[in-house]
Amino acid sequence: MGKDTIADLLTSIRNADMNKKGTVRVVSTNITENIVKILLREGFIESVRKHQESNRYFLVSTLRHQKRKTRKGIYRTRTFLKRISRPGLRIYANYQGIPKVLGGMGIAILSTSRGIMTDREARLNRIGGEVLCYIW
């Protein structure tokens, strides 16, 4: 039985966001590095650094906390992450069938033959792949 590193990454980010933690530490793999780079590029994460501890590499990510002011006071915006394709049920989509998350407001992360990319990049390159997760 294998370990789902993508689900571990998303759960760590979700838990840190809910508990108002500033940083997240996850095990570094090629897939998690590429997903974190996409989150950094899209503005969900402020910064990322690679940390070595006893022959294992970890990614230490600083989360971006946005505060908005309303009549009732200041509240934090939440980042929603949802795992779509999982080890027990893989979900694939061609470039025409790539779903738009919240009508284009969110992003879908895909694993394609040209690497891990967002739904917009996959549509521009006209390639499909495995839908890993939704982020909005």
From Swiss-Prot:
GO molecular function, one term: rRNA binding
A single Gene Ontology CC term: ribonucleoprotein complex
Chief location of this protein within or outside the cell: plastid
Signal peptide: none
Pfam families per UniProt: Ribosomal_S8 (PF00410)
Nucleotide-binding in keyword set: no
Subcellular location: Plastid, Chloroplast
GO biological process assignments: translation
Keywords: Chloroplast, Plastid, Ribonucleoprotein, Ribosomal protein, RNA-binding, rRNA-binding
InterPro entries: Ribosomal_uS8, Ribosomal_uS8_CS, Ribosomal_uS8_sf
Top-level taxon in the UniProt lineage: Eukaryota
Subunit text: Part of the 30S ribosomal subunit.
NCBIfam families in the record: PRK00136.1
HAMAP family according to UniProt: Ribosomal_uS8_B
Job description of the protein: One of the primary rRNA binding proteins, it binds directly to 16S rRNA central domain where it helps coordinate assembly of the platform of the 30S subunit.
Family per similarity comment: Belongs to the universal ribosomal protein uS8 family.
This protein's name: Small ribosomal subunit protein uS8c
Lineage: Eukaryota, Viridiplantae, Streptophyta, Embryophyta, Tracheophyta
Gene coding for it: rps8
